[in-house]
Amino acid sequence: MDLLTLWNLEREEVLKIIEDAEYFKKNRYGHEILKNKSIALIFESPSTRTRMSFDLAVNELGGHSLMMNEGEIHLGKKESIADTARVMSRFVDAIVARVKNHKTLEDLAEYGSVPVINALCDLAHPCQILADLLTMKENGKNFKGLKLAYFGDGNNVSNSLMIAGAILGMDVVIATPRSYEPNGLFVKKALEIIAKYGEGSLTLTDDPEIAAKDADVLYTDVWISMSDKNKQMDEILKIFPKFQINDEILSKAKKDAIVLHCLPANRGLEITDEVIDGKQSKVFDQAENRLHAQKAVLKYIFEH
């Protein structure tokens, strides 16, 4: 089974992945789930948390990881993605890919014969969000009815947060500048999932105070995403500052609210030092949880 986006998962499946991640966090070593299995790790862009967490996850589950950076693999250059997928499927048992374009993942999944995991692309970041959900749960947050407020650019992280929130019955509010809203297809899918389960909600706004009011979780990401390299910083600095998570915005949330950021952070831009280093910040627990969530994802795809 592939994991390219979260919208193909049922609520029970998401909850089981989180439950397994909790187990792996408490029991880090001594597993052989991936014994005699080799996992290719394809990275088209530099990474700290994603690379470390997946590399360690594979090895700590008893498998072998094969790291392939851009420049070490053809992947559409000199060889079609389809042919690359076919060849790699003869060597490895699964492919974990952090790529620039979602279409690359779709092609790997279509033409390969082994499971493909989206470790990040321009449209979605499902593995990150599963780690986020673990972080919320271990901080006493019940998913159903939880208010999750996201601030900043409507990017891959916001897209996947909407889907996860819809699956679990959250009230998700996405606060972005106009014309920086999340991807329309992901909005549509989230609303369909909300209708399916009959609970939860999705609100898009350009007012960060509406998002912050009585929020249980405040979340932000960098203002210049991987799909926005052509944006000028002066444009960003003109329209994004009011979406910064700072003490004033945090004061409008619930007293026991937590703050998340998928990292790396541009301190002083999307989040202040005071908040990211403050008591309500769980960003480094969140980063650690990538390891445990990746293990749960690997377990899941080999069981389905």
UniProtKB/Swiss-Prot annotation:
Pfam families: OTCace, OTCace_N
Any single GO CC term annotated in Swiss-Prot or TrEMBL for this entry: cytoplasm
Catalytic activity: carbamoyl phosphate + L-ornithine = L-citrulline + phosphate + H(+)
Pathway: Amino-acid biosynthesis; L-arginine biosynthesis; L-arginine from L-ornithine and carbamoyl phosphate: step 1/3
EC number of the protein: 2.1.3.3
Compartments it resides in: Cytoplasm
GO annotation terms (biological process): arginine biosynthetic process via ornithine; citrulline biosynthetic process; L-arginine biosynthetic process
Residues noted as binding carbamoyl phosphate in the record, renumbered to the chain: 47-50, 98, 125-128, 262-263, 290
Molecular function terms, GO-annotated: amino acid binding; ornithine carbamoyltransferase activity
Binding locations of L-ornithine: 156, 221, 225-226
Keywords: Amino-acid biosynthesis, Arginine biosynthesis, Cytoplasm, Transferase
Family: Belongs to the aspartate/ornithine carbamoyltransferase superfamily. OTCase family.
Task of the protein: Reversibly catalyzes the transfer of the carbamoyl group from carbamoyl phosphate (CP) to the N(epsilon) atom of ornithine (ORN) to produce L-citrulline.
PANTHER family linked to this entry: ORNITHINE CARBAMOYLTRANSFERASE, MITOCHONDRIAL, ORNITHINE TRANSCARBAMYLASE, MITOCHONDRIAL
Name of the protein in its database record: Ornithine carbamoyltransferase
Gene: argF
